[in-house]
């Protein structure tokens, strides 16, 4: 099973969090993109992956999307995603 945890932070307080489970046979990359799309589905556009996000995610299976990753203004400091379980 693949699980990705998404958290929205503002002023060092977690505003919202969501864990996405994926049991599909997709590649790890597809699972990450699908989970991120699901986290952003309700009220947020999908962030743009910058080089710093890609590098952090490769190294730590975790990254933070700040205002520069979004086209529209966001009402929080950053969106953090982290892989918490992988097969």
Please place each PLM-identified region on the residue numbering.
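Short, extreme N-terminal segment that most often corresponds to the first beta-strand
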Residues: 1-19
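Generic structural motif
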Residues: 11, 23, 84-86
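Acidic, low-complexity intrinsically disordered segments
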Residues: 32-87
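Short, flexible N-terminal segments of the mature chain
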Residues: 14-42
């Amino acid at each position: 099973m693949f699980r990705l945890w998404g958290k929205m932070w503002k002023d060092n307080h977690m505003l919202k969090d969501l864990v996405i489970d994926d049991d599909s046979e997709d590649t790890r990359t597809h699972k990450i993109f699908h989970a991120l799309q699901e986290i952003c589905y309700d009220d947020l556009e999908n962030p743009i992956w910058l080089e710093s996000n890609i590098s952090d995610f490769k190294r730590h299976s975790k990254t933070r999307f700040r205002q520069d990753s979004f086209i529209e203004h966001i009402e929080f400091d950053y969106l953090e995603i982290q892989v918490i379980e992988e097969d």
